[in-house]
Swiss-Prot record:
Subunit structure as annotated in this protein's UniProt entry: Part of the 30S ribosomal subunit.
Record's function text: One of the primary rRNA binding proteins, it binds specifically to the 5'-end of 16S ribosomal RNA.
Gene that specifies this protein: rps17
UniProt KW keywords: Ribonucleoprotein, Ribosomal protein, RNA-binding, rRNA-binding
GO MF terms held by the record: rRNA binding; structural constituent of ribosome
Full protein name: Small ribosomal subunit protein uS17
Pfam families, alphabetized: Ribosomal_S17
GO BP, sorted A to Z: translation
CDD domains: Ribosomal_uS17
Family as reported in the entry's similarity comment: Belongs to the universal ribosomal protein uS17 family.
InterPro entries assigned: NA-bd_OB-fold, Ribosomal_uS17, Ribosomal_uS17_arc/euk, Ribosomal_uS17_archaeal
The organism's place on the tree of life at top rank: Archaea
Keyword RNA-binding: yes
Length: 114
């Protein structure tokens, strides 16, 4: 008989818990992984690896010399729990966690737009 996993309340506005249940220990909703630090929004650039996506985060940087803003972007590796399904081009919310591997320090919390 499978046990029912309790969904944690992350108290993040605009992010709903997923409907699927997973047994991933690195899931912020059903596992033991804590979300702390920054929350970012970005577009999924690559979703080819198993349980990992590359998210492109675009932000504005102020250039003091020219008194203008320039658009910069960075690619962030994020863990993808089994209970959340994404495709390339989806807008997702990611949260900072403890390091999961050498390059993965964020996890996907939810999908904003498909």
């Amino acid at each position: 008989m499978p046990k029912f996993k309790q969904v944690k309340n992350l108290k993040i506005p605009g992010v709903e818990p997923p409907e699927k249940v997973c047994s991933d220990p690195n899931c912020p909703w059903h596992g033991t992984l804590r979300v702390r630090g920054v929350l970012l929004e970005g577009v999924v650039a690559k979703a080819r690896a198993r349980r990992m996506v590359v998210v492109q985060h675009v932000y504005l940087y102020y250039d003091k010399k020219y008194n203008r803003y320039e658009r910069r972007s960075k690619k962030i590796h994020a863990h993808l729990p089994d209970c959340i399904s994404v495709k390339e081009g989806d807008v997702v919310v990611i949260g900072e966690t403890m390091p999961i591997s050498k390059t993965v320090k964020f996890t996907v919390l939810g999908v904003k737009r498909r």
